[in-house]
Amino acid sequence: NKYCNIKCSKVAHTVCQYGESTKPSSKCNKVSITSVGVTEEEKKLIVDEHNRFRQKVAQGLETRGNPGPQPAASDMNNLVWNDELAYIAQVWASQCQFFVHDKCRNTAQYQVGQNIAYSASTAAYPGIVSLIVLWENEVKDFNYSQGITKENFSKVGHYTQVVWAKTKEVGCGSIKYIEKGMKSHYLVCNYGPAGNYMGQPIYTKK
């Protein structure tokens, strides 16, 4: 397949390594999969929630931080959905290698970034927006003037990708499954072009 021509520092592309199918892999047998993929409604929710939060930050309305508030931004793009990013994210989500990032997810167009989220409940499957909010909440630990560092990256890296100004497109894959009686929702979002370059500001201060 065409993805076998895309190499990332010698590592095979996810779609080359695991194949073109988005069906759950045999690794998923340890859980009970109930749905694969995002619905049209969920796609809209994902894009709208990212843009709502990006605009909130860009307008200087995010009061949280370490220290807060976050400065306003002058260069924040509005994100649009990208089906190819979503497809590659879904191939990876369907491997059930939970909480691990894949090694090569780029497209011919983009270097691609990634966020992963998980939530579970006994009552109902956690909604897709609640998973994105987990990423946004990392803003509480972010110091804009310090930026992304090796030390803080694990605490703030999802937030910084969500609001990385130069990112233009997002596409996500998801699986819902039951494990030990818990209704679990696992979300992988891919971003193009990627954010989270150390030493670069996440956006230009207004």
Swiss-Prot record:
GO terms for cellular component: extracellular region. Keywords: Allergen, Disulfide bond, Secreted. Gene3D superfamilies: CAP (3.40.33.10). SUPFAM superfamilies: PR-1-like. Pfam families: CAP. Residues 48-191 form the SCP domain. Expressed by the venom gland. It is found in: Secreted. InterPro entries: Allrgn_V5/Tpx1_CS, CAP_dom, CAP_sf, CRISP-related, V5_allergen-like. Its main location: secreted. Disulfide bonds join 4-16, 8-104, 28-96, 172-189. Belongs to the CRISP family. Venom allergen 5-like subfamily. PANTHER family: CYSTEINE-RICH SECRETORY PROTEIN-RELATED. This is Venom allergen 5 2. It comes from Polybia paulista (Neotropical social wasp). The lineage of its organism: Eukaryota, Metazoa, Ecdysozoa, Arthropoda, Hexapoda.
